[in-house]
Amino acid sequence: MTRIAVQTRSSREQAVSDVALLERVAEGDVRALSELAARHCLSLRALAFGILRDAVEAEQIVQATFREVRYEAGRFDPAHFPVFGWLAEVTRVGALQRSRVRAGLPEILS
């Protein structure tokens, strides 16, 4: 069996980098937003897909998540949530809202 060495950052290093990226996003840095999206989009898409069971809708929810991140980044407080936790919560709420609409139920206002 062949083993492949994968170099990864520790969770703490990644979290610090995520906070730095989000600070840059708050300053209007589109590249930072792209890097943050590239880093987390697969996990967020899987989360949304787990709720919606539809790949296209899951992708739409992830795109909506990063649109919200673009406008709300300056309000994020890393003392309350890790960045990925916030991204996951925005994605989860968006997917649940979409699921409610699909089922003909009213949206829940946040």
Model features per residue range: what roles?
Residues 46, 55-58, 82-85, 99-101:
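Short, intrinsically disordered/low-complexity patches at protein termini
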Residues 1-27, 31, 35-38, 67, ...:
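Intrinsic, short, N-terminal disordered tails of RNA polymerase sigma-factor systems
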Residues 3, 26-34, 45-64:
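Short, charged helix-capping/linker segments at alpha-helix termini
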Residues 53-54, 75-79, 104:
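Short connector loops in the HATPase_c
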